[in-house]
């Protein structure tokens, strides 16, 4: 393509937003709403439409950054949903609509979307069509699975994760997740088939 998509916090905009620009760095345009916090912007194949996650339906303000009273933690904002839009930001459409964190979405070469969600009470990986249809849960184990990416041919998904057995560490993980937080600890890299097998 002829444009890049990226997230950044610019002067006058309090939270990260999604922008596009020409390959030479000119013609920078905000393509997200300017409200809430956004993450993980991608072009669909062909470059005519984009995908990103945003908290803007939960409020125009930035969601609060986590404090570190509980150690080093990351926010897992339950107001994140996944959206598609035309490449210029028009035609914004919400494609996830369940309670809880839906973010970290990426796109395969065929336009299928893979993402992280806590819709079932744990950080798991799901896939869906670019319009939100044909939702499939791909992982099912205790502990955080996320950050999925398709292989170049779309046949595999690589992701970070960790299975946490019952016990104090899992209890801490669930307690934090119920507060919209996650403590990234030891994680491993996994590869599975695009349908969640192997």
Predicted feature locations:
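A flexible loop/linker signature enriched in serine peptidases of the S9 family
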Residues: 7-18, 32-38, 53-82, 96-102, ...
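A short glycine/small-residue-enriched secondary-structure motif
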Residues: 19-28, 33, 49
